[in-house]
From Swiss-Prot:
PROSITE patterns: TRAM. Residues 146-204 form the TRAM domain. NCBIfam families: aIF-2beta, PRK03988.1, PRK12336.1. Belongs to the eIF-2-beta/eIF-5 family. eIF-2 functions in the early steps of protein synthesis by forming a ternary complex with GTP and initiator tRNA. Keywords: Initiation factor, Protein biosynthesis. This is Translation initiation factor 2 subunit beta. Heterotrimer composed of an alpha, a beta and a gamma chain. Gene3D superfamilies: 3.30.30.170, Nucleic acid-binding proteins. GO terms for molecular function: translation initiation factor activity. The gene is eif2b. SUPFAM superfamilies: Nucleic acid-binding proteins, Translation initiation factor 2 beta, aIF2beta, N-terminal domain, Zinc-binding domain of translation initiation factor 2 beta.
């Protein structure tokens, strides 16, 4: 009986280490996207969905909502109507993984989405934890296809760039505001537009 118990114990530990190792190796493939005509193509969309173990339609719906556009899944690719920066695509995928994949208690990706009384929960198979999937605020900013240099706007800083500048996403545009913090409301003047990147200065 002792040998049998020890064997069972070894098997249990091996399963734990296997799951732990798979979690530590969890790396979301970097988005490979490019602009083609008036569309943006995410070339490795299916690979990303498979890695995070989520339904392709669910991931696509989330991305379309965040980009404020329409699109379709075509084979292993996702096609979005409009021209978007690859940095914006990668930021949205990271937000999806944070909200719908990573356990907030143990930080592991061994999770699944389940519904309980119409509430969508993220349940972790690694630690047993669960939490409601937090819904992001509905997009209230305009799609703004007509931003112009010299235009003055009131904006709310949403995040920080690696350089420490405030970041505001507005439709297909990404604005950078110096000396600003997330949650801060500021009045800015557009100094330069390069594609979908908008450089600003404070407007007093």
């Amino acid at each position: 009986m002792t040998d049998s118990y020890e064997n069972l114990l070894k098997k249990a530990y091996s399963h734990i280490s296997e799951k732990s190792a798979s979690s530590e190796r969890f790396v979301v493939p970097e988005a490979k996207a490019y602009v083609e005509g008036k569309t943006t193509i995410l070339e490795n969309f299916a690979e990303i969905a498979d890695t995070v173990r989520r339904d392709k339609d669910h991931l696509m719906k989330y991305m379309l909502g965040e980009l404020g556009t329409s699109g379709k899944i075509e084979g292993n690719r996702a096609i979005f109507n409009g021209k978007f920066e690859i940095s914006q695509i990668r930021m949205i995928i990271k937000s999806y993984v944070d909200d719908y994949v990573i356990c907030s208690e143990c930080g592991k990706p061994d999770t699944r989405l389940v519904k309980d009384d119409r509430v969508l929960l993220l349940r972790c198979d690694a630690c047993g934890g669960h939490r409601p999937v937090r819904k992001r605020k509905a997009r209230t900013e305009p799609a703004s296809e007509n931003l112009e240099e010299g235009q003055v706007l009131d904006v709310e800083i949403q995040s920080l760039s690696k350089r420490g500048d405030g970041v505001v996403k507005m439709g297909r545009y990404i604005m950078y505001v110096s000396n600003a913090k997330p949650g801060q409301s500021v009045k800015i003047k557009i100094s330069r537009i390069s594609g979908s990147i908008v450089f600003t200065e404070r407007a007093e």
